[in-house]
Amino acid sequence: MDPVDLALILALDCSASVSFDEFALMAGGCGAALRDPDVMAGLTGGPLGASLCALLLWSGADAQAVSVEWTRIATPEHLEAFASEVADTPRLVPAGTTAIGAALVACEALLAALPAPARRQVIDMVGDGRSNDGPPPVPARDRLAGAGVTINGLCVLHEEADLLASYTDQVIAGPGAFALECQDFTGFAEAMRRKLQREIAAASRPIIQMS
């Protein structure tokens, strides 16, 4: 497969603090954000004209699932198909604890299985709580950042008002890393749209050495 501008993992929290209605808002919000014209143009408008995207669901230390495998996006039709899969994804992992470190390890494995080189690799960690299970996030975060991967965060504050500080300290890392927040899942789609626009705008700056 030809190289791409961006490899992007959407990693969504499915822990017990996320109700099934909230999960539907989160998945649907991701689908809506992906369909934004600026996001669509960014994913397909880089120097190489394509991106790879995947969806990972996570909760406890032993609960991660790749819900949508790596999908090459080079046309609006490709993106629409991926957005539909994301919006309609079933909740494949149990509503358990919050194991951010284990989720990052799963993202690390997913990036290792990339079907093509990517100029930029980004993980979107989406959650509504601090890590309370499994390995601590920092070792996996540091390994990923050391490999040139950017980990960004989107914090939903309805459970923990100061979650952004925790994500800033323990989760986000890598070139250009940032975290955004939204108050609850009703504002999730707009927050994700802004986040994707910001991430994709950086995709034209290569940070991964391709062989």
Where are these regions (language model features)?
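Acidic, low-complexity intrinsically disordered regions
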Residues: M1-S211
